[in-house]
């Protein structure tokens, strides 16, 4: 099968219908200039063969294949190729009856593309199968050697080279079919999974359930039979027990009534003894009251009075102390306020000064603008009057200005002559002085060098001093700061110890229980671990926590145990281990209810009012997490007793509302709360810790600074010595005659510079004056026009000056208002500061008065405490006397209590006996009623009563334990009730249907699995055959590959071999030998040699099961002419089994072709000419097409 003709229409550069006829069955060549359309003919063949990678035909999509992308009115591209099919050995499968096969492919812009085979529509798969069956697989196109294919073959990996062998062996189509079969197996596998899912998720569970239901039904029937049997046995036992109870109760009743009579007699005897003892006790009480009662009362009254006086004086004393503390707090607040006011006052004064300065600037600017406005007005008036302004702004006539210009010119000329004379004299003097200086001795130079050396030494010392980064006297300043910090730390330690002495409960000290003890495991007292967010809640939080405020928090229960056993604690402590404590917290829903009830600002969880470290969360929830804090009693009452809340609530004043029945409150101590006191201790601790850290840092800095300071002092001493040396040298230099001469020289040089500058400036002045004079002359000639121009300019300047003056005036007024406002604020701050000073004086006087009163009251309190102690001692002595008398009475009372106890026991026994009698009567009645009821309910009792309890009968209670039967019966009733709810009476029939469906699906599953195993077996068998065919193809191609390469490059050899450690089925790679040396890889070959390797492989592929058509696109591009000619001759003489269509630009190649097609452009129209070739030359036969130049 080979190409006979190609018809192109609308394809790429071929706009009109173009027929390319007369293809030779063996060797055809296409040539032409670049861009003439020769490769488009090959692209059309690839397009028709169904290529999917459009980049190989130089297009990004199918629309690019239409002439000018459809923008020239042509919207369809069509390619038709007629194949000669007369050789039936090479005929595609199914087309053996056709001598010619015409295949057409069309693509329409915006539409779909279609195939036609012999004029009949065909799908893409059918066309692919047609060409693949004759080895023309365009998507793996080893028959198509395009531009760059040589390079691609060289870059192929072993699997890709193997795929070329597979294509040649014809096993590639099998691979495609195999993949399709595997996909079918995957689909069947999905069906199998579906069947398996139905079996596992639907049918199998249903069968299992039905089997269970069948078992339940059978079990239900069994239970019913057993219940019936056990019911008769248990009822018979109950009947016998009821008859026995009725007969036994009568005898027991008589026995209990006799016991009651005996106990009543004992009660009467004890009552008589108790009466006699009570009389003796009353007599003793009367005697005791008579002797001691009056004195005891007077002592108790005296003690109470002393305590009242002491409490009153102590309360007054505490109140004074509280007032003193309040005044001190007020003084501190006033001092802080005054400090803040002073800062604000200073800032405000700076702001006033800044704004005032700004106002002055605006006033100056406004004044300047006003003056400018007046000058502009004056200038306008002068111009209106016929005057003109000169450069200085003064008004003058043109003639006057011209005279002034002449004067300026004359003056400049005079100054220039003077400067010239002065310059000449200075230059002469300089020349003579320089000659004198050269004659001076070299002593000055030596001193100058010494001075420069000292100066450099000083600079070096200064650089070294700067590198030390040391400030002078820094060490002394740090030492003074160290002394001040030490004093502050000592004062703070004393203050801290004094505060702890006042509040011993806030101290927690312990000894390390073991060596290397981690003190971080002991967190401290609860009071020390919290910070109160708002001091107004301190009292409430203290009430919430209660004694837990002094609990100790630790990390684990192990730490707690070690502290208690070996910590040598000074007093008893309760310890909270964070890892074991069970903490509860008020739920967020409860909090929302409470907030909705009284308002979100009036109720808070106590836990939210304190700050603490996150690691203490559980401990703090334990102490504060279960209580609300409200702002007043009304809200607290609402929250505590609301049925949705029912939670303990505390007011800010310390009143407690507990829904479980307790309410506490009333007047509380006026002293500051423990938490407030402890906050003062913590503040001192924090300040002390800060100062100690500062001291440590300062000591480290001093230690590091010591060496630096010593080094600095040494360098400073050296620098001072060099400075003194430099001063002496400088004085010596200044007093030398050379120095004086040098100063005169410098003065002369300065005079020369000034004279030259004066000459330059006078020339510029003279030039400007002359230019101005010339301009004024021109003005005189055009006086009227100049006057109008000056008038307009003057009007413009006047308007501009007026606008600017108005703006300046407005800004100044705004700034004045701002200054007045901020001045008022400053005065207000000053008045407030003065008021604070007055309040501070008043507070200081009040503090002084309170301190005096407290000193006096302290003595009175001490005296009252002594009186209380004395009264309590006298009262104690009197109570001891009374205690002795009380012991006698106590003995008598004990005897009375003994008799009362006996009576109580007797009465209790009587009540128990009465209860037992009632119980026996009730049991006898119940038993009789039960016997009657059972006889009426169960007819079989009368008939079988004589068998109850008899051996070897159905009612043998020894063989069948009735109690166990009753328990078993109860369990069976429960089982029956449970089974009765779930038992399915249709389970037997439904189970049969489900099992039939299960068997049917299992049968289908086995069929699918058998089909799958057969397909896999077939694939395995075909794989073996494929491997055999592939091995044969490899050996044949390998042999031809070496032979062709040796022909193209004499003395060389090549072969295809699997990579090391792999087989032929894994891939193949090139092995090349030049002479007797085998190369490791192709990179050791030249570019032309590598090209011959790739081309030899391609040609060897053509010798094995050749495709009917081969297309070569400029494969000789990288080869020289001798190799090209050899290739052409080889194709002509050795490859007579297939049709070759070759594109080439080299005569050595296309001269060997039987038919040559040449593409050209003539006047912008594309043409294709056909030539038949022989050794005599080329005879043009026909020109087939014309088309527009490709885009």
Swiss-Prot record:
Central component of the condensin complex, a complex required for conversion of interphase chromatin into mitotic-like condense chromosomes. The condensin complex probably introduces positive supercoils into relaxed DNA in the presence of type I topoisomerases and converts nicked DNA into positive knotted forms in the presence of type II topoisomerases. One of its GO terms (molecular function) is ATP binding. The lineage of its organism: Eukaryota, Metazoa, Chordata, Craniata, Vertebrata. It is found in: Nucleus; Cytoplasm; Chromosome. Belongs to the SMC family. SMC2 subfamily. One of its GO terms (biological process) is cell division. The SMC hinge domain, which separates the large intramolecular coiled coil regions, allows the heterodimerization with SMC4, forming a V-shaped heterodimer. Keywords: Acetylation, ATP-binding, Cell cycle, Cell division, Chromosome, Coiled coil, Cytoplasm, DNA condensation, Mitosis, Nucleotide-binding, Nucleus. InterPro entries: P-loop_NTPase (IPR027417), RecF/RecN/SMC_N (IPR003395), SMC (IPR024704), Smc2_ABC (IPR027120), SMC_hinge (IPR010935), SMC_hinge_sf (IPR036277). Residues 521-640 form the SMC hinge domain. This is Structural maintenance of chromosomes protein 2. Disulfide bonds: none annotated. The modification N6-acetyllysine is found at residues 114, 222, 677, 1158, 1160. Residues 173-507, 672-936, 963-1031 form a coiled coil. Forms a heterodimer with SMC4. Component of the condensin complex, which contains the SMC2 and SMC4 heterodimer, and three non SMC subunits that probably regulate the complex: BRRN1/CAPH, CNAP1/CAPD2 and CAPG. Its main location: nucleus. It holds the Pfam family SMC_N. ATP binds at residues 32-39. GO terms for cellular component: condensed chromosome; condensed nuclear chromosome; condensin complex; cytoplasm; nucleolus; nucleoplasm; nucleus.
């Amino acid at each position: 099968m080979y190409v006979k003709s190609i018809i192109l229409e609308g394809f790429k550069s071929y706009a009109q219908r173009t027929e390319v006829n007369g293809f030779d069955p063996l060797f055809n060549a296409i040539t032409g200039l670049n861009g003439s359309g020769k490769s488009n003919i090959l692209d059309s063949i690839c397009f028709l063969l169904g290529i999917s990678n459009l980049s190989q035909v130089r297009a990004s999509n199918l629309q690019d294949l239409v002439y000018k992308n459809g923008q020239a009115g042509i919207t369809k591209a069509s390619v038709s190729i007629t194949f000669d099919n007369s050789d039936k050995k090479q005929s595609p499968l199914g087309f053996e009856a056709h001598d010619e096969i015409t295949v057409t492919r069309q693509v329409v812009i915006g539409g779909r593309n279609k195939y036609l085979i012999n004029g009949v529509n065909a799908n893409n798969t059918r066309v692919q199968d047609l060409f693949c069956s004759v080895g023309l697989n365009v998507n793996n196109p080893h028959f198509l050697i395009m531009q760059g294919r040589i390079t691609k073959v060289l870059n192929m990996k072993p699997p890709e080279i193997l795929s070329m062998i597979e294509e040649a062996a014809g096993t590639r189509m099998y691979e495609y079919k195999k993949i399709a079969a595997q996909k079918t197996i995957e689909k069947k596998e999905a069906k199998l999974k579906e069947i398996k899912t139905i079996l596992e998720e639907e049918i199998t569970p249903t069968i299992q359930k039905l089997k269970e239901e069948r078992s339940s039904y059978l079990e239900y029937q069994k239970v019913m039979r057993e219940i019936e049997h056990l019911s008769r046995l248990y009822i018979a036992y109950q009947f016998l027990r009821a008859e026995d109870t009725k007969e036994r109760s009568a005898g027991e009743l008589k026995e209990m009534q006799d016991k009651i009579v005996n106990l009543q007699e004992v009660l009467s005897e004890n009552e008589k003894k108790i009466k006699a003892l009570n009389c003796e006790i009353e007599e003793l009480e009367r005697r005791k009251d008579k002797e001691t009662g009056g004195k005891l009362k007077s002592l108790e009254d005296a003690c109470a009075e002393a305590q009242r006086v002491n409490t009153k004086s102590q309360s007054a004393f505490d109140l004074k102390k509280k007032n003193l503390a309040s005044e001190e707090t007020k003084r501190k607040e006033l001092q802080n306020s005054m400090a803040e006011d002073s800062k604000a006052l200073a800032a405000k004064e700076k702001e006033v000064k800044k704004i005032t300065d700004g106002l002055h600037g605006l006033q100056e600017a406004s004044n300047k603008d006003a003056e400018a406005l007046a000058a502009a007005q004056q200038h306008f008036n002068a111009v209106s009057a016929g005057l003109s302004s000169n450069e200085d702004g003064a008004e003058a006539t043109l003639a006057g200005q011209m005279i002034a210009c002449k004067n300026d010119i004359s003056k400049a000329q005079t100054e220039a002559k003077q400067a010239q004379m002065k310059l000449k004299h200075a230059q002469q003097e300089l020349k003579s002085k320089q000659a004198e200086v050269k004659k001076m001795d070299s002593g000055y130079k030596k001193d100058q060098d010494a001075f420069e050396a000292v100066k450099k030494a000083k600079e070096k010392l200064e650089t070294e001093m700067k590198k030390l980064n040391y400030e002078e006297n820094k060490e002394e300043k740090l030492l003074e700061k160290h002394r001040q910090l030490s004093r502050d730390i000592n004062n703070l330690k004393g203050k801290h110890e004094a505060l702890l002495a006042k509040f011993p409960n806030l101290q927690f000290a312990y000894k390390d229980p073991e060596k290397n003890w981690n003190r971080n495991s002991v967190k401290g007292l609860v009071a020390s671990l919290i910070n109160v967010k708002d001091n107004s809640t301190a009292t409430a939080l203290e009430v919430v926590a209660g004694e837990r405020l002094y609990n100790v928090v630790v990390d684990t229960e192990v730490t707690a145990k070690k502290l208690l056993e070996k910590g040598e604690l000074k007093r008893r402590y309760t310890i909270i281990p964070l890892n074991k404590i069970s903490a509860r917290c008020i739920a967020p829903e409860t909090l929302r209810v409470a907030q909705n009830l009284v308002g979100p600002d009036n109720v808070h969880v106590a836990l939210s009012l304190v700050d603490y470290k996150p690691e203490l969360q559980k401990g703090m929830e334990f102490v504060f997490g279960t209580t609300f804090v409200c702002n007043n009693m009304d809200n607290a009452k609402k929250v505590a007793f609301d049925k949705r809340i029912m939670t303990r609530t505390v007011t800010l004043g310390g009143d407690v509302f507990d829904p479980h029945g307790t309410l506490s409150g009333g007047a509380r101590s006026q002293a500051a709360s423990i938490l407030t006191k402890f906050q003062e201790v913590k503040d001192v601790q924090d300040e002390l810790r800060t100062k100690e850290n500062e001291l440590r840092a300062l000591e480290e800095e001093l230690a590091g600074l010591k060496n630096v300071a010593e080094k600095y002092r040494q360098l400073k001493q050296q620098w001072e010595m060099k400075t003194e040396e430099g001063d002496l040298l400088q004085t010596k230099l200044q007093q030398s005659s050379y120095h004086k001469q040098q100063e005169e020289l410098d003065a002369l040089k300065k005079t020369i510079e000034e004279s030259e500058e004066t000459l330059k400036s006078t020339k510029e002045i003279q030039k400007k004056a002359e230019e101005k004079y010339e301009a004024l002359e021109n003005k005189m000639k055009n006086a009227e026009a100049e006057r109008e121009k000056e008038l307009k300019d003057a009007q413009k300047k006047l308007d501009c000056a007026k606008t600017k003056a108005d703006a300046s005036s407005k800004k100044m007024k705004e700034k004045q208002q701002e200054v007045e406002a901020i001045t008022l604020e400053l005065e207000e701050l000053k008045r407030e500061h003065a008021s604070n000073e007055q309040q501070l004086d008043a507070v200081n006087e009040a503090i002084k008065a309170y301190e005096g009163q407290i000193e006096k009251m302290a003595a009175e309190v001490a005296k009252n405490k002594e009186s209380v102690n004395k009264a309590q001692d006298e009262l104690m002595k009197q109570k001891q006397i009374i205690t002795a008398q009380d012991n006698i009475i106590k003995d008598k009372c004990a005897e009375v209590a003994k008799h009362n106890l006996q009576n109580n026991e007797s009465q209790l026994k009587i009540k128990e006996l009465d209860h037992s009698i009632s119980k026996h009567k009730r049991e006898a009645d119940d038993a009789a009623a039960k016997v009657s009821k059972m006889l009426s309910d169960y007819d079989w009792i009368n008939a079988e009563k004589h068998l109850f309890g008899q051996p070897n009968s159905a009612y043998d209670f020894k063989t069948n334990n009735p109690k166990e039967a009753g328990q078993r019966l109860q369990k069976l009733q429960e089982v029956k009730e449970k089974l009765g709810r779930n038992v399915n009476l249709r389970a037997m029939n439904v189970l049969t249907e489900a099992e039939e469906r299960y068997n049917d699906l299992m049968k289908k599953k086995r069929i699918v699995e058998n089909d799958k195993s057969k397909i896999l077996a077939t694939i395995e068998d075909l794989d073996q055959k494929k491997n055999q065919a592939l091995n044969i193809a490899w050996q044949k191609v390998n042999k031809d590959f070496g032979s062709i390469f040796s022909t193209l490059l004499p003395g060389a050899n090549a072969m295809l071999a699997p990579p090391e450690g792999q087989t032929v089925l894994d891939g193949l790679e090139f092995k090349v030998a030049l002479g007797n040396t085998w190369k490791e890889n192709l990179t050791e070959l030249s570019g032309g040699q590598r090209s011959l390797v790739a081309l030899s492989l391609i040609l060897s592929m053509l010798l094995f099961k050749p495709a009917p058509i081969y297309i070569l696109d400029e494969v000789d591009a990288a080869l020289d002419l001798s190799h090209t000619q050899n290739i052409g001759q080889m194709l002509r003489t050795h490859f007579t089994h297939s049709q070759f269509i070759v594109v080439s630009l080299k005569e050595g190649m296309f001269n060997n072709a039987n038919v040559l097609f040449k593409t050209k452009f003539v006047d912008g129209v594309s043409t294709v000419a056909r030539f038949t070739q022989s050794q005599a030359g080329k005879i043009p036969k026909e020109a087939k097409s014309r088309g527009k130049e490709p885009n």
